[in-house]
């Protein structure tokens, strides 16, 4: 039977789901209708639409996950149900994170201005580079899934035996293996974060350089390019902030679940973990002029 704490958690989880679904469905519908009307799909719209679809899939998994944890948390520790849910959540989370990273890289090359030949060469081949990043993310997904499967097997094995007395050497060996696997998973998560961080740093350098050039030419410090720089920086920095919250919440959730799996407060760590897919869509809407204007007209 659900406790009062479970009911509060489920109400918050459902509210988080509905709000985020509205944002992502809106992004998908606007971009699809624009693509049909113009008979052309721009790279930014394609990435945004793919990100919205991926996030919708992740939100559905999160909702099922929330009901499972809130109403029948004991089923989460079974191989038949717990393992597929964790694997599916990881896949959708991986795709969402990498698509958001590709969007950050796209904004950087689309908006920033550097005279360096390497930057110009990469900018000219931007679509191909985004495709290469997506291919890299698929290879990393295969690697991560293999590591995660071993991680889950060991973790559920520990939970299954938690009521028994494990030999000290056996217990130490299992936890050592978990530490190594968690490190590998954290390292692969660091790749999209570092790419987005690099994008926002170079966007800032480009903005400083552009503003200095405007002042030297007596044109002031505000023009369309400056505003584009600032909007892109706000979106990428917001993504980085949400990604940091998401990443550390994931580490805390792993620790609580696999070390103290029946702790009642893991539910609220999950709400913080889901802040990234829940809030990111509205940041994208506010930062994209087409989406923002459409939203204003609807309101």
UniProtKB/Swiss-Prot annotation:
This is Taste receptor type 2 member 42. The keyword Transmembrane applies. The keyword Transmembrane helix applies. Receptor that may play a role in the perception of bitterness and is gustducin-linked. May play a role in sensing the chemical composition of the gastrointestinal content. The activity of this receptor may stimulate alpha gustducin, mediate PLC-beta-2 activation and lead to the gating of TRPM5. It comes from the Eukaryota. GO terms for cellular component: membrane; plasma membrane. It is found in: Membrane. Keywords: G-protein coupled receptor, Membrane, Receptor, Sensory transduction, Taste, Transducer, Transmembrane, Transmembrane helix. Belongs to the G-protein coupled receptor T2R family. Residues 29-50, 123-127, 209-238, 287-299 are cytoplasmic. SUPFAM superfamilies: Family A G protein-coupled receptor-like (SSF81321). It holds the Pfam family TAS2R.
